[in-house]
Amino acid sequence: MTSGKFDVCMPFIFREEGGFTKDRHDAGNWTGGKVGKGVLKGTNFGIAAKAHPELDVASLTQAEAAKLYRVEYWNACNCDLLASGVDLVVMDVAVNSGVRRGRSYRDATAPIRDAQKRVDGMSDKRRAFYKGLKTFSRYGKVWLGRVARIQAAATKMVLAGADKPAAAIKAELQARAAQAHAGAAKAKRQAAVAGAGSGAAATASVSTMPAPDQAAHPTVFLMLLAVVVGGIVVALLIHRARAHRELASAYAEVAAETN
């Protein structure tokens, strides 16, 4: 039974990790863990030369990679003991962000008995984590897409584990896609309103700016503060809209595959 759970989850992990890459600018592709240090061997099925300098990465088979994933991630996070769907999310967190974080998310959500709420909660934690990374502006879309696809796949597993018929599962996934789409539209509208307000505040702060000897006037400070806060709010709403769009797309895709 446990082997079956692992086998069900791995196609989703392999889909996200991809095949063989040998980008010399990626530190993970070097056996020394830094660009130019050691031998450039690359990454295959997500198994990197940095973590496994002893391997012939290029000739690694998917079956061999699966064995490594089972020991280093699946077993390390005790995924066999987790509910269907929850196991996939914890596994993907461990693979993409480290075993320590995978265990942390697993333990933090352990009190949540509802498997779907646990899947959603961990997925939200992932988005918040990625949003805080300095490289989010470059890789954010990729990360949010991955989180959404794993969340949607995990949701289907949860529903299937509840012995719901395919038609009911499809309907639930479609409903979630519609809900996420509506959430994206709402966040987009809110961002537009907040952006307009921030722009108005900026215009007002310039037009009402006092003489140079009064530059520290409280009114100027408050107006500038309003502009800064408005900009932060807009950025957060744009992030929310993007996350909802990715999730809507992922749910729609999984629903289309459900018959």
Model segments located where?
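Cell-wall polysaccharide-cleaving catalytic domain and substrate-binding groove, primarily
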Residues: 1-217, 221-230, 236-259
